[in-house]
C-alpha cells in the first residue's frame, strides 16, 4: 500500500473494474432486492440532494448484494419535457431560429440529437459517487418500451372513464405557453400593493369595498361574495353591483369561503383566474370569463380600451381609470407570495383552458388502503399523516402540456371535434370503425412528465409484457426519496402501480430530508451557497469556484456579493476530500429530520477518518503480512478457538460483533446516521486507538511468546478484514483497495469485496469479562494520560505511579495487564500503597482505585505556576467579557436567540475550565519546593 491515502488514485480505477466485470448486474439468485432510482432530469447535473440520495441507495444495494440477495438498482433518466425543450429552444434562439421555424418533427429530431450528445451528464456523474447501478439496463422515459407503457395506460384509463378532457383552471406559464405542475411553481414573498376598490350598488344606495392584489382581474369578476352570517351585508345578498369600467352588473352572493374579519368582509369573485374563486363559481353556477390570451395579454372579453395590453400595463390603466372615476378607496403597501414559473420566472396565472385530466378519487382509495393496511410502510411513520391528508383531499390531475417534447397524447379528432383514443391512428380507426377517408388530427399536446414517471417501477421492467424481470423484481423493495415529491411522484406511483399491476410498486418508502447549507439555508444559485458534490470529491481552485458560482445568475447584480462571500469562505478554494469521505458524511447526516445541514468541517473530519483507516491497514500489513505468509506455508489456518486468545483479542472481537449487530439494526431501520457512527466509533476509538496500541507491546517485544504474537497478528488481520466488509456499503473504494491485500491474509477467496458475505454478529463470541477487563485498562491508561495533560507532563516522560484502595479484581487485572499499562501509560514503576499517607500527588480514579502520580521532580513548580497564572488571567478576562454581554438586557433581548445561547454555553465552559485550572494551581502550590 502507498504510504499516503490518495482517493483520486483508487476511486475511478476501482469503479471502472467493478463496471467492466459486471458486478453491478443481478446474479440470478432466489431472493431479490430492487431499488428504482428516482429518474433525474436528462438536463440535470449532480447536486447535493442527488449525491445524498445515491449514497443511501448504494449503501442499501451493496449491503443486500453482500447478504446474498439478487440485487437490481434500476437506473435511468426522465425526459423532463419543459426543461429539455427550453435547453434546445435556447440553442435555436442563439442561431436566430424558433422551434416553429423547424416544425414539430424536425424539432423533436433536434432534441433527440441533443440528448444523444449532451444529455445524461448526471448519469455519468453518478459513477463518480460510486453508485453500483446496473448500467446495462439504463432506461429513459421516452424509450420505445416505456412509451408503449404510457400509451397503454392512457388508453385504458380513458376507456374506463378515468381520464377525460375538460375546461378547468390550471397553472399557466405565459412565457412557455403551457400548463405546469404545482411543483414547477415557486412562490416567493415580494413587495406589492393592496388596492381597495368601490363597487357601486346597482340601486344607487351606496357601494361595497373589495380589496385585491391584482386589480386588472376585476374585468373578469362575476360576483361579490359576503359571509352568509355577516350582519353588515345580509340585506344585500341577492342584489347586484355595477362592475366598474364595464357595462356589466354582477350579483352579491353568500358563501362560507369569505372571512368576515378580513378587510371589508367583501370579496371579488373571478372564477376564471383564481383557484378559490373557481370553486365558489362552481358552487353558485357563476359565469367563467377568461380575460387573458395565452401570453397574458387582455383579450376580447374586456372593454376595448384594455384589449391587447400586457396584464401589468393593463393593471396601471385600470388603477388610473378607477381613481379618475372616484372608485379607488385606497392603496396599501402589502407583502404577498407571488407564484413564478421555476424556469421562465414569469408570474403564473390561473388560466381556464381545455386540458386532459385523470379522475384521481377512484385511484386514491386503494392507494390509501395500501398504507393503512401495511402493504406500504413510510419511514419515518409521521409521513403517513401527510400522505393521507393529501390523498383524501386529492384533485383531478391535469396531465396535458402545451409543448412538443414528450409523449404525445394518443387522441385523435375528426373535423367535428369528436375524440378517438388509441395508441396509434391506425388502431383508432380500427377501434372506432372509422372510414379510411375521415380526416383525423392528433392532439398537439404532450403528457405531463410526472405521468410517465408514475409508471417507472413497472414500465422499466417490461410492463405491459409479462417479463421475467417484472416477475423477479416487482414489487420493488424500497423507494428512497425526498419529502417534497410525496404527492407529485410517490402517491401517483402507488395509484398507478395498484391500478395496472394489482400490486404496490414498493413495500417501503424511506423519506429523507433536504440538504441545506451549514446555516440551514436552502442551497440556491441566487444565494451563492451551492456546493457541487464533485468539487468536494475532486477539489476546485478559488478562481474556478468564483466563476462557477457567479456565472449564469438570474440576477447578475448578486454576482459581487456572491464573489465576496465565496472568497471569504474558501480563500484556498475547496480541497479534494474524495468520494468515500463525502459518502460517510452523508451517512452520518442521515437523521430523521426534514433538514440535512451540510457543514464542510464534517467532511474534513471524515476524510481524516479514511486516513486513519488507511494508516491502520498499513500498520497491520507491515507487522503481519510476511509472518502470516510464513506461518501459512503447508499449514491450514488456525481457528480462533485454537489460538488461546488473550483479553485484548477477546475484547476487540466482542466489540466487533456488538458493532456488527448495531450496524445491521441501523441499516434495517434506515438509521444510517447510527450505522456510520457505530463504524466510526469502533474503527477510530477501539480498533485504532486501543487494539493497535495493545498489539505493540506484544509484537515489538522480542521476549513475547510466539503464541502471543501469532494470536495478535491473527486478530489484527481478521478483525480488520471483517471491518472492511462491514464498512464497505458506506465507503466502498477505500475498503476495496485495502481488502485486496488484507483479504487473502485473512484466508478470503474472491476477486472483490463487493461479493463477499456481509459480517453477521456472533453473539456467543461476545465475552463480557474480556470487555470489562479491557475497559478497565482503558480507564486506567486514560486516567494517567489525563493527569499528564493537566499537569503539563511530557507525554513520553516515564513516570512513577502509586495505587491506593481498589478491590481484588483491580489487583488481578493489574497483574494480567501490567505490560500493557506500563507501555501505554509510559510508567517506569507501579507501586501499591498500604495505609500510609501518599506524597503530594495528582489523582485520578478508576472506580474505587486511586491512581496517584507524585509531582515532586516531575514538573518545574515555579514555571508551571506562572503558566497557570497566565492562563487563568486570560480566562477571567474572557469570562468577564461574556458575563458583561449576558448582563446587558438590551443584548439578550435583541440578539438572535442562537447567539445568546452560544454565549451562555461559552460562559459555562470557561467557568468549568477555570475551576479545573484553579484546582491544579492549588495542588502544585502545595508541593514541597
Swiss-Prot record:
Enzyme class: ligase
Catalytic activity as recorded in UniProt: tRNA(Val) + L-valine + ATP = L-valyl-tRNA(Val) + AMP + diphosphate
Binding site for ATP: 525
Positions of short motif 'KMSKS' region: 522-526
GO biological-process terms attached to the record: valyl-tRNA aminoacylation
Main function: Catalyzes the attachment of valine to tRNA(Val). As ValRS can inadvertently accommodate and process structurally similar amino acids such as threonine, to avoid such errors, it has a 'posttransfer' editing activity that hydrolyzes mischarged Thr-tRNA(Val) in a tRNA-dependent manner.
Record protein name field: Valine--tRNA ligase
Location within or outside the cell: Cytoplasm
Source species, domain of life: Bacteria
InterPro entries, sorted: aa-tRNA-synth_I_CS (IPR001412), aa-tRNA-synth_Ia (IPR002300), Anticodon_Ia_Val (IPR033705), M/V/L/I-tRNA-synth_anticd-bd (IPR013155), Rossmann-like_a/b/a_fold (IPR014729), tRNA-bd_arm (IPR010978), tRNAsynth_Ia_anticodon-bd (IPR009080), Val-tRNA_synth_C_sf (IPR037118)
SUBUNIT field: Monomer.
Coiled coil: 855-926
GO molecular function: aminoacyl-tRNA deacylase activity; ATP binding; valine-tRNA ligase activity
Annotated organism of origin: Nitrosococcus oceani (strain ATCC 19707 / BCRC 17464 / JCM 30415 / NCIMB 11848 / C-107)
Entry keyword set: Aminoacyl-tRNA synthetase, ATP-binding, Coiled coil, Cytoplasm, Ligase, Nucleotide-binding, Protein biosynthesis
Chain's gene name: valS
PROSITE patterns reported in the protein's UniProt record: AA_TRNA_LIGASE_I
Gene3D superfamilies: HUPs, Isoleucyl-tRNA Synthetase, Domain 1, Valyl-tRNA synthetase, C-terminal domain, Valyl/Leucyl/Isoleucyl-tRNA synthetase, editing domain
